[in-house]
């Protein structure tokens, strides 16, 4: 950085410390990843200076011809990546994308089905603390108490009983394959619209490692970071018949000018995801997650639902007398970044929780393979076995540092 150190030394110091944190810790938060230098360059471009209210060819400001080129490329690449007729790349986040869809097909007070946050859903799927749970009438569905997988019989029963206008499929802490075809059958029976939130699994869907809802669902939303390895942002996919209503709900419905520098970075990320090596990356993400889950099971820990089909593992740490908060805080101190997470039928409040959520996208981007993930999994277990033993902490921290030094972060930094 050439100008920031002098212009704002306090911000510069904080950014340098964040660089060091990412370099010296193993990032295992399932919703985080590392963008490429190309994505980072697009994100920090002069497009941040340009206002471009409207859509390509229909802007409210002049001087948008370059912005039009960038947004059109992002749209076409997103459509190609997911095999979709329509794409809106303007949502600032996944939450904004979800709200735009709600506004497109629901009126205040209308009911919709969404996965219970306590069972792995997302805030925007009807949590009472979120606007989706305040404006509309959410009907939560959950997982089976024995298998800890989505209870499709319950979904069908609730749909028949409440006749919702919309059924939302998707999760933020669910490690198993989602059967979109079952949701489609249920929605058809009760005459409901369908929305799939694939924020966590979009990279898997794009590469064919998870069934796609495209063609079955009316609306598909996702974030552009997580497994897609793009900038933080949102994306809506649908059919051409929904283009007008969705465009209007994004702008001017809930947003003003789009973030053109972010859209440029999205376009670069979509292009990267269209390359053959991206599919190999997702293969490794899945292999790493499977290895991690297997290590936990071998070491006597309980993995929610017994394993994983995707990029994340939900681990019940209560079997070791720990809360999720204690486990996450302790792991942070030895160099592993995870988040506390509620597990299905959790007796602890969300701020305490009984589990931790771990993901493999960021470490896979960093270069770790299954053999490395086995080492990481064992180090995590070593710590959780004796979290208050100072000698054990020192040993585990040393092992983590060896791993971070083996896989440096230089390739993700701008000079």
UniProtKB/Swiss-Prot annotation:
Pfam families: SHMT. Keywords: Amino-acid biosynthesis, Cytoplasm, One-carbon metabolism, Pyridoxal phosphate, Transferase. One of its GO terms (biological process) is tetrahydrofolate metabolic process. Its EC number is 2.1.2.1. One of its GO terms (molecular function) is pyridoxal phosphate binding. GO terms for cellular component: cytoplasm; cytosol. It is an enzyme of class 2 (transferase). It is found in: Cytoplasm. It catalyses: (6R)-5,10-methylene-5,6,7,8-tetrahydrofolate + glycine + H2O = (6S)-5,6,7,8-tetrahydrofolate + L-serine. Pathway: One-carbon metabolism; tetrahydrofolate interconversion; Amino-acid biosynthesis; glycine biosynthesis; glycine from L-serine: step 1/1. InterPro entries: PyrdxlP-dep_Trfase, PyrdxlP-dep_Trfase_major, PyrdxlP-dep_Trfase_small, Ser_HO-MeTrfase, Ser_HO-MeTrfase-like, Ser_HO-MeTrfase_PLP_BS, SHMT-like_dom. (6S)-5,6,7,8-tetrahydrofolate binds at residues 117, 121-123. The record marks 225 as: Plays an important role in substrate specificity. Its cofactor is pyridoxal 5'-phosphate. The modification N6-(pyridoxal phosphate)lysine is found at residue 226. PROSITE patterns: SHMT. Its main location: cytoplasm. Homodimer. Catalyzes the reversible interconversion of serine and glycine with tetrahydrofolate (THF) serving as the one-carbon carrier. This reaction serves as the major source of one-carbon groups required for the biosynthesis of purines, thymidylate, methionine, and other important biomolecules. Also exhibits THF-independent aldolase activity toward beta-hydroxyamino acids, producing glycine and aldehydes, via a retro-aldol mechanism. Belongs to the SHMT family. This is Serine hydroxymethyltransferase. The gene is glyA.
């Amino acid at each position: 950085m050439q100008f920031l150190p002098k212009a704002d030394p306090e911000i510069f110091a904080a950014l340098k410390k964040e660089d060091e944190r990412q370099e010296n810790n193993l990032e295992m938060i399932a919703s985080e990843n590392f963008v490429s230098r190309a994505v980072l360059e697009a994100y920090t471009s002069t497009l941040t200076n340009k206002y471009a209210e409207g859509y390509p060819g229909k802007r409210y400001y002049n001087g948008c011809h370059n912005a039009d080129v960038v947004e059109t490329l992002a749209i076409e690449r997103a459509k190609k990546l997911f095999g979709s007729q329509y794409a809106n790349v303007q949502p600032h986040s996944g939450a904004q994308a979800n709200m735009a869809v709600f506004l497109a097909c629901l009126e205040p007070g209308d009911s919709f089905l969404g996965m219970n946050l306590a069972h792995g859903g997302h805030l925007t799927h009807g949590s009472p603390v979120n606007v989706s749970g305040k404006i509309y009438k959410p009907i939560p569905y959950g997982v089976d108490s024995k298998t800890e997988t989505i209870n499709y019989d319950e979904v069908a029963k609730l749909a028949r009983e409440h006749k919702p206008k919309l059924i939302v499929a998707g999760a933020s802490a669910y490690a198993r394959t989602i059967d979109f075809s079952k949701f489609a059958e249920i929605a058809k029976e009760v005459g409901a619209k369908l929305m799939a939130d694939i924020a966590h699994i979009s990279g898997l869907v794009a590469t064919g490692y998870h069934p796609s809802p495209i063609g079955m669902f009316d609306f598909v939303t996702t974030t552009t970071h997580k497994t897609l390895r793009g900038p933080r942002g949102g994306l809506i996919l649908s059919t051409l018949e929904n283009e007008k209503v969705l465009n209007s709900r994004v702008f001017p419905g809930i947003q003003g000018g789009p973030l053109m520098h972010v859209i440029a970075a999205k376009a670069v990320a979509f292009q990267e995801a269209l390359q053959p090596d991206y599919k190999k990356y997702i293969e490794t993400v899945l292999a790493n997650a499977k290895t991690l889950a297997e290590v936990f099971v071998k070491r006597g820990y309980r993995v929610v639902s017994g394993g994983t089909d995707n990029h994340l593992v939900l681990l019940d740490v209560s079997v070791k007398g720990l809360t999720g908060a204690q486990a996450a805080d302790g792991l942070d101190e030895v160099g592993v970044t995870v988040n506390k997470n509620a597990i299905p039928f959790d007796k602890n409040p969300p701020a305490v929780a009984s589990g931790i959520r771990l993901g493999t996208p960021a470490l896979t981007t960093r270069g770790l393979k299954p053999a490395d993930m086995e080492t990481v999994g064992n180090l995590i277990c070593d710590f959780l076995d004796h979290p208050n033993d100072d000698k054990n902490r020192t040993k585990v921290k040393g092992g983590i540092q060896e791993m971070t030094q083996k896989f440096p972060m230089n390739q993700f930094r701008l000079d």
